[in-house]
Amino acid sequence: MNRYILIPEDTIRVLPPEDGAEAAIEIFCSRTVIYFEIAQVRDVCLMHNVLSNRRRVDALCFTAADRLLEREQMVLVPTDRADYAAFLTDFRTYAPETLDFSKEEDYIPESCDHNGHHHG
């Protein structure tokens, strides 16, 4: 599973349901756009001690398969982003009732970057 921590240059927003399509999360990172169907989000929690922009912050973490490749991804959205509050409000609006937004965990970085380097 890929992990992705949003950087300040990325944008994230919730697209409401429209023309038969379900609500989705849209992420612009660099020149790439990634979509996640909100109904397909498998898990959500608040992660503590995520390294973002050279600081430790909390981040909302969600796990879901992206719409294009249908590969499961773990996405971390730092809570100190200017667009975080609006994103969280919209995400909760369209999230399935089964998602538990009260869960919290400590972030454990990967020990391998999949390029032959091992950390920790």
Residue ranges with predicted function:
Residues 17-50:
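Phosphoinositide-binding peripheral membrane targeting modules
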